[in-house]
């Protein structure tokens, strides 16, 4: 931080910043946009390492498995490993394990990459079949969305199956000339069709996203700062979890 910037900070803010040991970094729209790395990202991450501040990647985007996210980061020139990643797929898995420990079969409205993450955790992905009844319905950001599967998800929602959404984002940031309809818009579609909202939405601003970081790395809430681009998800997560942001 420059001397001029330091002079503009209040004593209270300086004290809070002095406690920060770890950054929880959003990904889409924060360190990259679509397939484009922001020009400041590499230097920013290097500066944090030099300052002794660790970081992890905390994303509401469940469309990629952790393995596929690591491949993307590597292609962008960012060094990361599995321990650096916490996605809403992982948050949904943790939630289901905690709240529905007997659940084995899930209807997953999500990408093939996301589905592999759930299968890796030991779950069975139900088919688009009225006789293949799931224990839990999971609705996510599905870039491979098929109309029949959206209808099937709506059917299970109408039947009272436990219903978990991965994130409330209405659209996903992109560097392309299009609108990427995200999970929050898909759950609204299901709500209009069935009258039912998700039982829980595990992504930011849900505080459990940051609590997973506290537990994984052993930090206190006041030692973690949330960095992101969206007020209604990223910025709101920090106070919900007692962190800085």
Model-derived features: positions:
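HAD-like aspartate-dependent phosphatase fold
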Residues: 1-27, 31-245
């Amino acid at each position: 931080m420059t001397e001029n910037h330091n002079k503009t900070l209040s004593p209270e803010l300086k004290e809070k910043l002095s406690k920060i040991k770890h950054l929880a970094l959003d990904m889409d729209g924060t360190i990259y946009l679509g397939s484009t790395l922001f020009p400041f990202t590499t230097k920013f991450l290097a500066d944090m390492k030099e300052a002794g501040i660790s970081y992890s990647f905390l994303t509401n985007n469940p469309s990629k498995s952790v393995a596929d996210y690591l491949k993307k980061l590597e292609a962008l020139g960012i060094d990361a490993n599995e321990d650096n990643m916490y996605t809403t797929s992982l948050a949904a898995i943790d939630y289901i394990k905690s709240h529905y420990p007997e659940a084995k079969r899930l209807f997953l409205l999500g990408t093939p990459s996301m589905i592999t993450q759930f299968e890796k955790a030991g779950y069975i992905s139900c088919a688009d079949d009225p006789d293949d009844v799931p224990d839990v319905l999971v609705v996510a950001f599905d870039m491979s969305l098929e109309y029949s599967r959206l209808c099937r998800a709506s059917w299970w929602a109408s039947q009272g199956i436990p219903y978990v959404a991965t994130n409330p984002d209405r659209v996903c940031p992109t560097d392309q000339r299009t609108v990427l309809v995200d999970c929050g818009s898909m759950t609204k579609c299901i709500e209009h069709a069935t009258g039912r909202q998700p039982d829980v939405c595990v992504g930011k601003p849900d505080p459990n996203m940051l609590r997973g970081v506290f537990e994984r790395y052993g930090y206190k809430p006041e030692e973690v700062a949330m960095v992101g681009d969206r007020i209604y998800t990223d910025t709101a997560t920090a106070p919900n979890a007692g962190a800085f942001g």
